[in-house]
Amino acid sequence: SDGDARKCLNALEIAALTTPQGKEGVVCVDLQAAMDSIQKKAVVYDGTGDDHYDTISAFIKSIRGGDPDAAIYWLAKMLHAGEEIRFITRRLVICASEDIGLADSNALVVAQSAAQAVEFIGLPEAQLILAHATLYLATAPKSNSATVAISEASREVQEGRTLAVPDHLRDSHFKGAERLQRGAGYLYPHDHKGAVVPQAYLPEGRRYYTSTEHGQEKRIKERLDFWRRQFEELSARK
C-alpha cells in the first residue's frame, strides 16, 4: 500500500492541489513544488464517506474509553485532512453530556467554550483549543446516566404511557386558579427545613435517573440518598 508508484501518485496529487494556477488557469508544477510534495504523506480521507464517519467514530469512542493518546491522534488526522471544525466541536459538545455528563459537568462548559473559541480564533491555532477540549474530555470521569434517563423517559412517552399533571403541580398563576383547585395542596420546599418535604411529583415507583459513583456524581448520589431517607422519616411521622 506504501509502494513507490502510489507514493508518486500521491505526491503528484498534492502538488496539483497545492500549486496555484497560472495566468491562463494552468497549474505548472515546478521542481521545488514536486520536491515539497514528495516530503508530504497524503492522508487517506473521504470527507463525506466512510472515512469521515469512521474517523469521528474512532475519535468519540477513544474519548469515551478514556484513551487521550488515541483521541488526540484521531483529532490530528481529521485536522490534517481538512475536516470541518464545526463538525468536530459539535461532536465534542454532544460527547460532554452523553458520555461524561454529571460525573464532571464542567466538561460541557469546556466543550461549549471550545466550540465558541475556535470560531473566534480559526486555524491553525484553533487546533490547540480542540486538543485542550479533547484531552479534558478523554481524561474526565465518565457517566451516561443523563443519556439513559432521557432515553427511558422518552420511551415511556412514545409508547403512550403519558401522565396527566396532578392538580397540586398545575399552574396557579392566573385568575380563577383557586376556584379550579389548581395548585391546591402544593408544598413549597423552601418553607420547610432543609428545603426538603415529601411530595409526589410522579406516581410511586417511576424512576428514570440512576446516579453513578463516578466523579462528581458520587456526591449527587449521596445527596439523593439523604433526601430519600428524609422523605421516608417525614412521611412516617404523618
Regions found by a protein language model. Give the residues of each.
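Short amphipathic beta-strand starts and helix->beta connectors
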Residues: 194-196
